[in-house]
Amino acid sequence: MAGTANCIDILIAIILPPLGVFLKFGCGHEFWICLLLTFLGYIPGIIYAIYAITK
């Protein structure tokens, strides 16, 4: 199942978007973008996290 997101990854991304991205990518630029978007608004953080995890 390499390259695909499972249900747990998506669920974590919905509950805590930066955590879901961190678990997938570590502390890279994806994490910081997601953290910033989550601070600016929870919904943009969720959308970006799901996008980043599933791409």
From Swiss-Prot:
One Gene Ontology cellular component annotation held by this UniProt entry: membrane
**Keyword set includes Transmembrane:** yes
Origin: domain of life: Eukaryota
Q: What is its main location?
A: membrane
InterPro entries named among the record's database cross-references: PMP3
Instruction: Quote the tissue specificity entry.
Output: Expressed in shoot and root of cold stressed seedlings.
What do we know about what induces or represses this protein's expression? Early induction by low temperature and abscisic acid (ABA). Late induction by drought and salt stresses.
The family database entries (Pfam families) matched by this protein are listed as: Pmp3
Q: Which PROSITE patterns match?
A: UPF0057
Q: Which residues cross the membrane?
A: 8-28, 31-51
UniProt name for this protein: Hydrophobic protein LTI6B
Species per Swiss-Prot/TrEMBL record: Oryza sativa subsp. japonica (Rice)
Taxonomic lineage of the native organism = Eukaryota, Viridiplantae, Streptophyta, Embryophyta, Tracheophyta
Gene name per UniProt: LTI6B
